[in-house]
Amino acid sequence: MSKLKEISRQSTTSWSPIAQYPDYMAVGTVTGTIGADFDTSSKLEIYSLDITNESKQMTLKGSTSSSTRFNKVVWGQASSNFQNGIIAGAMDNGTINLWDPTKILASDATDGGGSDDQSSLIGVGQRHSGPVQSIDFNVQNPNLLASGGSDSEVFIWDLSDPTQPSALNPGSKSQQSSDITCVAWNKKVAHILGSASYNGYIVIWDLKSKKTLMTINDRNRKCKYRSIVWHPSEATQIVAASEDDDHPVIQAWDLRNTTSPVKSMEGHKKGVWGLSWCPSDNALLLSTGKDNKTFCWNFDRQEILCEINDNNSRNNINNNSNNSNSDNNNGNTDPNAWNFEVQWSPRVPALLSTSSYVGKVNVYSLQDVNEKSTSGSSAGQLNALGIQEQTSQITPTIKHTPNWLLRPCGAAFGFGGKIAVFGRNKKVTAAANGATSPSSSSSPASSVQQSQLQQQQRVIHISHVTTEVDIVKSSEQLENVIHTGQYEQYCQEKIDQSTSDEEKSIWGFLKVKFAKDDRLKILDYLGYDIETIKKELKQFLGTLPELPIESGFNELPIENVDDQSKPEPTTTTTNETVHLEPVVDENNNVVDADSFFDTAASDANKEQQDDSSSSPSTKSPTTTTTPIEFPGDEKEQMITKALLVGDHNSAVECCLRLGRYSDALILAHAAGQELWKKTQEAYFEIVRSPFGRVVSCIVKRDFQLLVKSADLKDWKASLAILCTYAPPTDFKILSGILGDRLDKEASDLKSAILCYICAGDIDKTVDIWSRVSQQHQQQQRQSLTSSGNSITVLEQESNKDLQNLIEKVSIFRSACNGNSNNNTLNQVLSMKYAKYAEILASQGNLSASLRYLAPITNSQCKQEYGVLFDRVYRATSNHQGIPQPPFPFQLVDVYSSNQPIQQQQQQQQNKAQQVGHQHQHQHQHQNQHQHQHQHQHQHQPPQQQQQQQQQQQMGRQNTFNQPPQPMGQHQHQQQQQQQQPPIMMNQSPMQNNNNNRIPMMNQPPMMNQPPMMNQPPMMNQPPQMMNQPPQMMNQPPPQMMNQPPPQMMNNNQPPIMMRPMQPSGPSPMNPPPTMNNTQPPPMMNTMGGPSSVNNSQPPIIPMNGNPLPMNPMSPMMSDKSNQPPMNPMMNPMNPMNPMMNPIQPTAPPPMNPMIPQGGSPMINHPPPPMNPMINNGPVSTPPMNPMMNQVVPQNISPPQMPTRSPVLENKSSSPSSESFTSPAPKPNVHNKTPSIITGQLGVTTPSEGPSNEDTERFVEKLQRSIQELNGRTDSKVWEDANKRCQGLINKVSKKDISAEAFKALDAILASIVEKDFKKASDTYIQITSTPLWGEVGSQSMVGLKRLIDLGLKSH
């Protein structure tokens, strides 16, 4: 918000409504004022904002002088006669002057003075007897001008002829006549006019009836209305401003109820003089008053949005409404220099102007258009030290977004061809719902209700939009054909619609693929129609001489044999071969044309045997007309001699050499099968004519030689021979070979497509169609570029080509559905299907889109369009039996930002633990009500366990009967801990409110003694350290920490134990069974492996000199049968327990300040309140012993241990110990520095994880195994397994599992790869009883189980 320009004039103004001059302003010298130079002249000037000019003054465009001054100036709308409108002035002498702005703009304004030329003055109207106070043009009829004067008269001027304006009275003079201060036309109803009087009355005039419609007056206040404006959109609401200093109020009246105003806005301290309603936003209303304040109001909420002032600074608009309560004058020294007029620009929404009595017209913008920094400083006053202080100006902001900055409407495309359209409807006001009560203006609740009723209602319309109408229509037609199976009819329609021979041939070949006699139809499309050829042969035979035989070939009897009774020769075994007409011998037996030459020799031998076996007398005598003579020619005699002696080979050879091929073939046929074949081969080798080579291929059935050596220009003849003679299996292969030659050698793609269609090769056909489509698109792109058309045309053509391709492929695949090789799609076809499915999905055809996405098996395509597949599947309910695709995104557990990483890992472990080890907690929950104080950390539900773990990780030390504090109080809790006095073992924490004894951490074991119930305080007992100070977190402990106490150096000295005091009263609890050496407590083992302790090992004394308790009150010491196997690390007598081993100090947990900073980390420091040791890593089971999770190697034994110890044996073991060992817990992720203590003692830390090569190999084998099991059994089980295994793949890829877990998983996967699913199942069962289950996660482990089950079912 900023001030743009100013005019050094004491004038009344009017913005230009002309679209050609949106930033022009008419300025007329206002009456009743005088300048510093005592100039009494009057001018009418036109200024331009001209923001390109850096000057702060507006640019003068034209001016003219006037004989009298102005009370009001108004610039009217354009008309047919005056394109730039008319400027009207309410003159002080009682006249209405009219100017032509076109002539004023044409005047010379270079000198800055007014021109005395009165040519721009086009008319003067004189009806008022006193000064004219206000004028206003009718919005809907620019020829009507209303005027009101100090003579209490209102006139309507007709400006049809502005040179002679005529005036009429709208009605009789009102009884409450007074000076007319303002007139205003209704914005919606053209014949309604309002006028305001100085006596506080508002009169509504009706020009149709020429009378007063109503009179409005505030009975409670003596308002003197100075300005009125009609509501821009509500025809019955008018707003009036009172200039009375006692009642500076702005009132909104509704004509339907004039008892009281519907709104009253109070903010000015003195009378309000000017009002202006924003034409672009009905909620913005400007007001200016004698208190030197100009406010911008939110009319709907009746609140001040900002104050507009001229303080010669950058920020001229102040948004602090409280400034209205101040008495300052915003930098103006003269309190009387207030703005008397304010106006919005009708063309530029953000522009407004003010006119003041200080001789300035200021122009402001609600938007900040200055280039200066918003934090710029303006010079301030000198302070007491004489230094000039800089005062920064804060850029104010209006809490209302103007309508011109709001989108009136908008649209957004959604998935599935949806479009969401929003817009703003008309306001629902109180006036539309009925009359307003008189008390509505004074009640705050009703004001809020009014504001809510006036809120704009926004409605969102969701529609379905189809941008590719032709594609959707073609797709629906194709889906209908596939559903009904009317393929031939569909192909015929495509043939009729085709404009090129190529398309007709393709659709014709596709059509014959559905016919029973498809190969005969192919012959027809190749141009070899059988009936036509027969006619041609008949005509050709008529031109040849007749044979010198008694009966011709056409007279041979042929019997019409039914197709079912015909023998099935080789070339007519299926419907795909040509049904040739049968050849019948003299015995009416059908003879196979292909085997005729092969059987001729055997038939001849048979006839000879029959002739020799029969006697001459049995034969019928033959009649010969010509005696038989032996040849006399020398060549024929030699052939005859060879026949006479039975040398058929020589006879045939002689015939071949003499060129008598027919005689050679006849003699070879009579001689036998072997000679017949030799003669046949010799004949084809001698005869090298094209005809002979074709006949050779047919007779020898060497069609592969034909398709590989035939001239490609005769490809149709070659394909016809294949259709006629080739077996069905060879036909497809040979057709593909012929297509390959046409594609690669001749680059004849059109002919190659037809051959591939005959071969049923979808992949190669699609490849050629794709290449043809790309060539077609390149040609179109070049043509469109040269013609200058839009690229949208190219996209539409590309979509049409894709639709044509999908139609052909769909029909082709339907014709070849019997071939199993066509069930999978190659990469090219997969991409085409996916692209087409994406187009269908964008058009809202989700069912068809899903059908094209389902058969895609290409991995690259599935990865690229996996999101689309999942989205389409979820968006439609018509799944058509298609299984749900895998989720394309990775599932990630989201935790709170203030939750520690250890806690997140612990939560994941607890989730898996509840699934994998639920049976281990059943017995504990059964005894919960009996031992809730002794084993509270064991029997709590998972939520409470998690809270305890969080408290331990955050380092809080809660006493037994103290509720846990929230995580947000962690830091405050640490401060309290540093100031708490040490709590001794014999103090109140040993008792609870119920006087039930709670076992302490450092209580000594009591052998064969009654339990210690209520102990008196132990005097002189040193405090016991429960934990190490935080200074030892990443530092080696002091040297004394590595040495045992003095009492541990003597093996013969018994352990030091505290003697319990006798209880003062009876115990409230039954004494638990005591311990003895003959019945040791059971070992606690939850890690899955065997654990035992050497019987000769003595009990181990902790660093404080007291043996750890064996928990004599625990039911686990007495009831062994009801307890699950426990972890030996939890046994207090186990030397592997870190608390029992003084030689193995461990780093304390992080974020656990036990002492104030700067304190000594030695043992003699007073301990904090008791708290179990903090768990540094994730665990697989709830800890029985807080120290069970410390990393301690099992191959290190403490030196100089006592020799006397009860015998401890492990009563449980796990079969998983044979294959897998329990992994050590992961190191603390918060401890960035390696443990120095571990390095000094030679402790080996657990491995970080598998290598990159191992993980990649694992993931590859798992993905391959998943794909191999796809489609063998239940698809739902496979989908579930695939979904679960994706999480395992993510874990392995990120190395979120330990090396031990990876080794176990790799063993299972190796068995799956080797198809040894029984072994994989056994290995899996072993893992379920180990913590590896919880580390890997139940989801991933169940996924492996699903794969194993699928393998067992399929094998």
Swiss-Prot record:
Region (Disordered): 108-127, 311-338, 558-585, 602-632, 898-1035, 1190-1255
Matching InterPro entries: Sec16_Sec23-bd, SEC31-like, WD40/YVTN_repeat-like_dom_sf, WD40_repeat_CS, WD40_repeat_dom_sf, WD40_rpt
Biased composition (Low complexity): 567-577, 612-627, 899-917, 939-953, 967-1034, 1205-1223
Assembly information from the UniProt record: The COPII coat is composed of at least 5 proteins: the sec23/24 complex, the sec13/31 complex, and the protein sar1A or sar1B. sec13 and sec31 make a 2:2 tetramer that forms the edge element of the COPII outer coat. The tetramer self-assembles in multiple copies to form the complete polyhedral cage. Interacts (via WD 8) with sec13.
Signal sequence range: none
GO terms, molecular function: structural molecule activity
SMART domains in the cross-refs: WD40
Protein's organism: Dictyostelium discoideum
Per-repeat ranges for WD: 5-48, 65-109, 127-167, 175-215, 220-263, 267-307, 334-374, 412-463
Keyword Chaperone applies: no
The family this protein is said to belong to: Belongs to the WD repeat SEC31 family.
Disulfide bond residue pairs: none
SUPFAM superfamilies found in the cross-reference section: WD40 repeat-like
Localization terms from the record: Cytoplasmic vesicle, COPII-coated vesicle membrane; Endoplasmic reticulum membrane
Annotated GO CC locations: COPII vesicle coat; endoplasmic reticulum exit site; endoplasmic reticulum membrane
Keywords of this entry: Cytoplasmic vesicle, Endoplasmic reticulum, ER-Golgi transport, Membrane, Protein transport, Repeat, Transport, WD repeat
Name under which the protein is recorded: Protein transport protein SEC31
Residue ranges with Polar residues bias: 1230-1252
Function summary: Component of the coat protein complex II (COPII) which promotes the formation of transport vesicles from the endoplasmic reticulum (ER). The coat has two main functions, the physical deformation of the endoplasmic reticulum membrane into vesicles and the selection of cargo molecules.
Biased composition (Basic residues): 918-938
Protein topology in the membrane: Peripheral membrane protein
GO biological process: COPII-coated vesicle cargo loading; endoplasmic reticulum organization; endoplasmic reticulum to Golgi vesicle-mediated transport; intracellular protein transport
